[in-house]
UniProtKB/Swiss-Prot annotation:
GO molecular function (one): polyribonucleotide nucleotidyltransferase activity
Enzyme Commission number(s): 2.7.7.8
Protein name, per record: Polyribonucleotide nucleotidyltransferase
Domain KH residues, every copy: 589-648
Job of this protein: Involved in mRNA degradation. Catalyzes the phosphorolysis of single-stranded polyribonucleotides processively in the 3'- to 5'-direction.
Species: Micrococcus luteus (strain ATCC 4698 / DSM 20030 / JCM 1464 / CCM 169 / CCUG 5858 / IAM 1056 / NBRC 3333 / NCIMB 9278 / NCTC 2665 / VKM Ac-2230)
PROSITE patterns given in the database record: KH_TYPE_1, S1
Taxonomic superkingdom: Bacteria
Subcellular location: Cytoplasm
Keywords, in A-Z order: Cytoplasm, Magnesium, Metal-binding, Nucleotidyltransferase, RNA-binding, Transferase
NCBIfam families in alphabetical order: polynuc_phos, pppGpp_PNP, PRK11824.1
């Protein structure tokens, strides 16, 4: 029986000494009822299916493009059964959500403006090699299935992940589609998407970060620091690979693509509506959008919109049946006024120049009891950062297709509706909040202390209390302050800044104006949101979103340089607020570590956990033992942690006891000839009945139970160690002193309990 005809194309990615990667595109075999379907392979073992579908009719009442991108991670792709109770996939993982955003951002601006039919792109990961990263491959899959559908889409779009490999020997190379294991030796890692425009490749999306090992590679091994120039070099290095991917897609679409689909395209307004609004409102809107204060400006704009609607679309007016068009034309005119002023006068909405930064304030220790807190303000954007420290056993466990199974630094970003003066839903985070938290997390991970140096799980929460431009970069700044306030020994301060872009055709040439520290309105009216975070020495994270079909890499390189100047200014403000880690808060747990021989792990744990549980009960500390013999001990106070460390050392790193050493012991067994006293876990001694007279006012003791009971604390001294290592004990001091010291010890132990 003959199967369906399969059409394919391949793009070979040559990484030189790092080998070749092959991306294979197929269509015709799977998901034949979808408008467009593509199977994409990375080498032999990683594959995914992308299917694009379109609604049969426009959605009523929608004034935006209803595009949905979903990524389905199937656990069978890695030969695993889901770990959930029902043993099936549930809500998407964080990796899947971030991949959805990675696909959506370059795809959305490539559709023709004005589509109101629902479009859905579903990417299903069907198989994956353990060491592979699938996200940028999924961009290519989504691009291809959308082109095959015949929708009005200005593809193809190529997506590639690039890693800067540098071992400090002087030879560095950007490697396409790196593996997870290779990223451990990489200085910088970026996902780039773009499309071919003439002889060049225009960049549409960038998501980049320094790696957790970047600091060590740069500072200790002499690797190249990821400066702005190096990042721009990486964008250029990505272009040939993007071109190869786009050419393979275009070749396949040419042979197997569907005829163009006639999808209705709706204009927001007709020319006559715009002309009427322009004639009436230009002068007044120019005045309104020179008001610096956001709330005052928005209130004035809304009030004037009502006037314009009444004047042009009121009862009996020419546009009485076209109020929606007038409102849209009003918004479009506002956008044009703001953009024209920026390009011609080099002046922005609030009166700033193109490179000016709003007023900055930074303050630490703003909340009681929490482990670390700070507030960072940039103009009307206000972010509160709060840091919480805990044992490493509280690190996040990850169940996804990634080989990463846990992470100790968790960054959560909240954007409540009141931050923009609005009402709305609160509760579980939306995709945008997850994405912003992940961006801030990537910006800070490269400067976190090593796990061995600072053995804590760290949860950082960014609360966007007020928003008027780049709360995500404000979160980076507030988090730097908060982490230092919590006593986290960051390797360097990190600051972030959001850059914008306005472009227009002037005398047949496209003119670009890059804006530093954009407002919310400039984000809405501009062509780009370009976020850059980093230390004084190098870039730690980048995110680029654009509404254009692509931006020349040279323009992005210039914006990177402009962003560095702003970042250095912000860093000076952060350093003035806190220049070094504070002492840890009294409410923060104290965590210490001790190394024990691996063959002693069982002894510390004990039968069915009896020994480790006893130590935890006796000291009040929490103990975690790792496979390499590292024991992490956490407690609310230093004394408890030290007591637990002594107990662990007594078992796994025992010191030979010496005559004359004193201990506060616990009676564990009574016999006719005396009492056995536990000095440390696993180390007991005999307090002979003849010695008990010191606890009985010098009188003879006939029954040990008359003086001591199991569980009782007693201060003792080692008086003899025989040839077999058995310990003989005596109560401490003279008769009266021994009684007093034992009583004091009992009282003290009861108070601590």
């Amino acid at each position: 029986m003959e199967g369906p005809e399969i059409t394919f194309a391949e793009a070979v990615i040559d990484n030189g000494s790092y080998g070749k990667r092959t991306v294979r595109f197929e269509t015709g075999r799977l998901a034949q009822q979808a408008a467009g379907a593509a199977m994409v392979y990375l080498d032999e073992e990683t594959s995914m299916l992308s299917a694009t579908t379109v609604g049969k009719s426009p959605r009523e009442g929608f004034d935006f493009f209803p595009l949905t991108v979903d990524v389905e991670e199937r656990m069978y792709a890695s030969g695993r059964i889901p770990g959930s109770f029902f043993r099936r996939e549930g809500r998407p993982s964080t990796d899947a959500i971030l991949t959805c955003r990675l696909i959506d951002r370059p795809l959305r601006p490539a559709f023709v403006k004005g589509i109101r039919n629902e479009v859905q792109v579903v990417v299903t990961v069907t198989s994956i090699a353990p060491d592979e990263i699938y996200d940028t491959v999924a961009i290519n899959a989504a691009s291809l299935s959308t082109q095959l559908s015949g929708l009005p889409f200005s593809g193809p779009i190529g997506g590639v992940r690039m890693a800067l490999m540098d071992d400090g020997s002087g030879a560095r190379q950007w490697v396409a589609f790196p593996k997870h294991s290779q990223l451990k030796g990489a200085v910088f890692n970026m996902a780039v998407a773009g499309r071919v425009v003439g002889d060049d490749v225009a960049i549409m999306m960038v998501e980049a970060e320094a790696t957790p090992d970047s600091w060590t590679l740069v500072k200790e091994r002499g690797a190249q620091a990821p400066t702005e120039e190096i990042v721009a070099e990486g964008l250029e290095a990505a272009k040939p690979f993007i071109r190869a991917l786009c050419e393979a897609q275009a070749d396949l679409v040419k042979r197997a693509g569907k005829d163009p689909v006639d999808v209705p395209v709706f204009q927001d307004y007709q020319d006559d509506a715009y002309a009427a609004v322009e004639k009436l409102a230009t002068d007044r809107l120019t005045e309104i959008f020179s008001i610096a204060d956001k709330q005052e400006r928005e209130s004035a704009s809304y009030a004037y919109l009502l006037e314009v609607l009444e004047e042009l679309a009121g009862e009996g007016k020419d546009f009485a049946e076209r109020k929606g068009e007038i409102a849209k034309a009003y918004g479009s005119l506002t956008k044009q006024i703001v953009r024209r002023r920026i390009l011609t006068d080099q002046v922005r909405i609030d009166g700033r120049g193109l490179t000016d930064i709003r007023k900055l304030t930074a303050e630490v220790e703003v909340l009681p009891r929490v482990h670390g807190s700070a507030i960072f303000e940039r103009g009307e954007t206000q972010i509160m950062g709060v840091t919480t420290l805990n044992m490493l056993k509280m690190e996040q466990q990850i169940d996804s297709l990634s080989p990463e199974t846990a992470k100790r630094y968790m960054h959560h970003y909240n954007f409540p509706p009141y931050s923009t003066g609005e009402t709305g839903r609160v509760g579980s985070p939306k995709r945008r909040e997850i994405g912003h938290g992940a961006l801030a997390e990537r910006a800070l991970v490269p400067v976190l202390p090593a796990r061995e140096e600072f053995p804590y799980a760290i949860r950082q929460v960014s609360e966007a209390l007020s928003s008027n431009g780049s709360t995500s970069m404000g979160s980076v700044c507030a988090s730097t302050l908060s982490l230092l306030n919590a006593g986290v020994p960051l390797r360097a301060h990190v600051a972030g800044i959001a850059m914008g872009l306005v472009s227009a055709e002037v005398d047949g040439q496209t003119q670009y104006a890059a804006l530093t520290d954009i407002l919310g309105a400039e984000d809405a009216f501009g062509d780009m949101d370009f976020k850059v975070a980093g230390t004084a020495e190098f870039v730690t994270a980048i995110q680029l979103d654009t509404k254009l079909d692509g931006i020349p890499a040279s323009v992005l390189a210039s914006a990177l340089t402009q962003a560095r100047e702003a970042r250095l200014h912000i860093l000076s403000v952060l350093n003035a607020a806190i220049d070094a880690p504070d002492e840890m808060a009294p409410t923060a747990p104290r965590i210490i570590s001790v190394r024990i021989p691996v063959d002693k792990i069982g002894a510390v744990i004990g039968p069915k956990g009896a020994m480790i549980n006893q130590i935890q009960d006796d000291t009040g500390a929490d103990i975690t033992i790792e496979d390499d013999g590292t024991v992490l001990i956490g407690a609310t106070d230093g004394a408890s942690a030290e007591a637990a460390r002594s107990a662990v050392n007594a078992i796994a790193n025992p010191q030979v006891p010496e005559v004359g050493e004193r201990y506060l012991g616990t009676v564990v067994k009574l016999t006719t000839f005396g009492a056995f006293v536990s000095l440390t876990p696993g180390k007991d001694g005999l307090l002979h009945v003849s010695e008990l007279r010191k606890l009985n006012e010098g009188k003879r003791v006939d029954d040990v139970e008359d003086v001591l009971g199991v569980g009782q604390k007693v201060q003792v001294e080692i008086t003899k160690i025989d040839d077999r290592g058995k310990l003989s004990l005596s109560p401490v001091g003279a008769e009266s002193d021994a009684v007093a010291e034992t009583a004091d010890a009992i009282e003290s132990s009861q108070t601590e309990a």
